[in-house]
Curated annotation (Swiss-Prot):
It comes from the Bacteria. Belongs to the class-II aminoacyl-tRNA synthetase family. The keyword Oxidoreductase does not apply. It is found in: Cytoplasm. Catalyzes the attachment of threonine to tRNA(Thr) in a two-step reaction: L-threonine is first activated by ATP to form Thr-AMP and then transferred to the acceptor end of tRNA(Thr). Also edits incorrectly charged L-seryl-tRNA(Thr). One of its GO terms (cellular component) is cytoplasm. Residues 1-76 form the TGS domain. One of its GO terms (biological process) is threonyl-tRNA aminoacylation. Its EC number is 6.1.1.3. Keywords: Aminoacyl-tRNA synthetase, ATP-binding, Cytoplasm, Ligase, Metal-binding, Nucleotide-binding, Protein biosynthesis, RNA-binding, tRNA-binding, Zinc. Zn(2+) binds at residues 384, 435, 562. This is Threonine--tRNA ligase. PROSITE patterns: AA_TRNA_LIGASE_II, TGS.
Amino acid sequence: MPRIPSPPQAGLRARAARAFRLELTHPFRHDLLGVDQVADGFEFFTDRSVVAMRVNGELKDLATIVTTTDVVEPVTIYSPDGLAILRHSTAHVLAQAVQTVNPEAKLGIGPPIADGFYYDFDVAEPFTPEDLKALDKEMSRIQRAGQRFVRRVVTDEEARAELAGEPYKLELIGLKGSDAESAEVGGEESVEVGSGELTIYDNVDPKTGETIWKDLCRGPHLPNTRMIGNGWALTRVAAAYWRGSEKNPQLQRIYGTAWPSKDELRAYQTRMEEAAKRDHRKLGVELDLFSFPDEIGSGLAVFHPKGGIIRKEIEDYMRDRLIANGYEMVNTPHITKGHLFETSQHLNWYREGMFPPMHLDEERDAEGNVTRQGQDYYLKPMNCPMHNLIFRSRGRSYRELPLRLSEFGTVYRYEKSGTLSGLTRVRGLTQDDAHIYVTEEQIRDEFARQLQFVLETLRGYGLTDFYLELSTKDPEKYVGSDESWETATETLREVAVESGLELVDDPGGAAFYGPKISVQARDAIGRTWQLSTVQLDFNQPELFELEYNAADGTRKQPAMIHRALLGSIERFFAILLEHHAGAFPVWLAPTQVVGIPVADAYGPFLDDVIAQLRARGVRAEVDHSDDRMQKKIRTHTKAKVPFQLIVGEEDASAGTVSFRFRDGTQLNGVAVDEAIERIVASIQTHELVDTAWPA
């Protein structure tokens, strides 16, 4: 980077729309109120859009002193980091407001999350809607006061003394201990403590310098509360166990959202209103697609006949695509001996996410003495170990590679009850799970092929807006050599870049056995969903001692690619349901055509039309109920049936039908043969038909 010259009046304005980097030639400290400050003749000018900075790649408060050798990059409030800082600072204001209104409240944690923030509190009584109104008022007062966020480095002993009345904060300090590297703190708790020094953030009165409130926190934060603005709102209250464990006390969690402006807050609220209308849990009941009976258990879905049709269509299309692209379909059992997951190391890394073992096969004599030792069996959380056994079941030649094994395999994950959410987070799920075994020379081409296959298949389901995310090694949770990880990561990066899609890094986000690329899809209202994953794995073939006969006559170890295109059938079902708001493309609709006679006399004519459609594989029926015609139309419109064929005297006499579409538009007098061909074509081409075709 070129150095910025430093004449006496040199300056720089950080615009939200123009990110930049600079290398300072003079040290400076930006004051906490956001007012220009001159140090050694260099003026650094900023406005409200800059809320923090990266110094040599690390996020820092604007109050941080930098030196002449530091490389500084402003962080705007509109960037992902800037939004997280805004939301984290708003969470602090919420906590201060709670303890102002209720001094007995004890603090949990308050991290930024996607589109918002939360803070956990230990209070005697749950928060009520009236409480939220009072907190909203107090937060507004704190925001207008412009209290400064001031960072202080403290020792463990100092932190314990200052936060003696906060048991949950003391627990976090205790977890950190004197050795930051051995801390047992992770996830959202890391906003409080983690590697490095302990810090407390004081909320300071800008006029008197008095500390009004404080919290254990790593930061960074906004310079002051006034910069939070008015684009925030408290959204809901929920119960949450401390540190996510049901063994710990249950706290009260207040959720909120924060945006750079009131207009952006309103836009977000509008999106949330639309999302509520599209909520798959709501639509699943309204459209009679699936349910979660209490008698079966939490997180275990039952698909009803209409939902079963949609699911079958999703799977059938996927299966046809797999076979056409060189996959071989396999099937494996739902349970297995625990030794298999010891070999795969899943018991080392995922034991807490697995259902408890079942101790089987033990035999005893009449006196109760064990005559045959039993062993532990597990519900499988992954399919890959069993696919490895299929590969290993006989000798393999390089001529067989790439070997692509695929399965609609049901797996089981012991998700905590508080994390379960409709079909998007369940305990029993079916993956379209594939494992591809390749030579080292085939890795790059096969990975590119898989990524292309994934994108083409997703487009067939009506999803078109994608970007890619590259998840790299977690330094604390991986197996294999650093060299193999680096090689695999660079291969994935090259293939991702060549796809032409946006690529976002996800540092430390990979599973323990290899880096991965995930396909992120944006739905009809702009939300992002992680869908497909393609992951390279050098570790599993080594653990299972997989080998093939190479062209030179030697025995070599294959590389392995994990590929889950839909993620899980259940979750993908939910995503499609919300993306289409229940109005599926014709090929996925449970009922594709309903015939509605204007009077009973025209029922036989429609019966013949519907019979012709059924002969062509169309899911069609005639509504012969006693309801009036207008009620029938309302019923099937509410059920989001793509085509309603209405026949009265004129149509019956002319041998035609009249189409009514989901949006209420109509196309009248269409010849029966033409109507059938149009309907069949819309199914074959995966067309999304909501309105009348051009005449």
